[in-house]
Regions:
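A short, proline-enriched helix->beta-strand linker immediately N-terminal to the Walker B motif
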Residues: 161-165
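Catalytic Walker B motif of ABC-type/P-loop ATPase nucleotide-binding domains
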Residues: 167-170
Length: 257
C-alpha cells in the first residue's frame, strides 16, 4: 500500500550505469525524488554528481538503466519529446552558461522563446522571475557587468522560468563567498517552499549540515547512503520560511531510506 504521507515522485532513476572508455562513472544508481523535496547530492570530485544531473536532464545517455520524469521514460524517449520534458526540469549549470552578448532580460527570456511563447507572455513571466530573484532593476545589464552572486541569480531565474517540477543545481554556490552563498541558498529554499523539488549537488558540508532535509552520498559512482533528516524549525525561521505542514521540527539523525 502506498504511504499517504509519501510525496508524489517527480523523478525516478533506476539501475543507472555510465562508463567513459574503461572508467565507470555511475554504477547501478537508484534514486527517487518526491514533489517538494530538497535533496543534497554530496560526494567528492569525480563521484559522478554532475554526470547524474546531466542524465536526469537528458543531456547525456546512460549505458544501462533509465530515468523516468512523469510519463517520460529515457529508454523510450523520442528526440522531439526532449524539449517538452525539459519544460518540467530546470537546471543551473556549474558555470552559469550565460550569454554575454545579451542582457539579463534576454538571457532569461530565451528559455521561453525556444518553446514558442508569445512576446506578451514572455515579458510578463520574465518580469515575475526577475522580481522573484531580486534582479528586475538589472534587466538591461549584461552578465559580464554583474557580480558572481548576481550572475547566479540570473541562472536561477532562467532555470525556473518554465515553472519546473524539479530544479537541478550543480554546485550553485561553488565560487561564491559565504554571505552570497547564504543568500543563494535562501532563494533556492524559497523556490522549494512553493512546491518545486530541488536536487542540489554540492561540496559545501556546512550548507548540508545546516539545511539538509535529505542527503544522498555518492562515492565512486554509487550511492553510499540516502539519509532523511527532520528539518529543524530554527533553520527555516533563519531564512524566513515557515515550517512545512506535517514536518517534524526535530532532527532525526540516522534515518535511512
Amino acid at each position: 500500500m502506498t504511504d499517504p504521507l509519501e510525496p508524489r515522485k517527480v523523478i525516478g532513476i533506476y539501475h543507472l550505469h555510465k562508463e567513459y572508455e574503461d572508467r565507470v562513472i555511475l554504477r547501478d544508481v537508484n534514486l527517487q525524488v518526491g514533489n517538494g523535496e530538497f535533496v543534497f547530492l554530496v560526494g567528492p570530485s569525480g563521484a559522478g554528481k554532475s554526470t547524474l544531473l546531466r542524465m536526469i536532464y537528458m543531456d547525456e545517455a546512460p549505458n544501462e538503466g533509465q530515468v523516468v520524469v512523469g510519463s517520460y521514460v529515457s529508454t523510450n524517449l523520442k528526440r522531439s519529446q526532449i524539449p517538452l520534458l525539459r519544460r518540467r526540469i530546470g537546471i543551473i549549470f556549474q558555470d552559469f552558461k550565460l550569454l554575454d552578448d545579451r542582457n539579463v532580460f534576454e538571457n532569461v527570456a530565451i528559455a521561453l522563446r525556444v518553446v514558442g511563447a508569445r512576446n506578451a507572455e514572455i515579458k510578463k513571466r520574465v518580469i515575475q522571475v526577475l522580481t522573484q530573484v531580486g534582479l528586475y532593476h538589472k534587466r538591461y545589464d549584461r552578465p559580464v557587468t554583474l557580480s558572481g552572486g548576481e550572475q547566479q541569480r540570473v541562472a536561477i531565474a532562467r532555470a525556473i522560468i518554465n515553472s519546473p517540477e524539479i530544479l537541478l543545481a550543480d554546485e550553485p554556490t561553488g565560487n561564491l563567498d559565504p554571505e552570497v552563498t547564504t543568500e543563494i541558498l535562501q532563494l533556492l529554499l524559497k523556490i522549494n517552499s512553493s512546491g518545486t523539488a530541488v536536487l542540489m549537488a554540492t561540496h559545501n558540508h556546512e550548507l548540508v549540515r545546516n539545511f539538509g532535509q535529505r542527503i544522498v552520498f555518492l562515492r565512486e559512482g554509487a550511492i553510499e547512503e540516502d539519509i532523511r533528516l527532520g528539518l529543524a524549525a530554527f533553520t527555516r525561521d533563519r531564512v524566513g520560511i515557515a515550517q512545512p505542514a506535517g514536518r517534524n521540527p526535530e532532527w532525526k539523525r540516522g534515518e535511512k531510506t
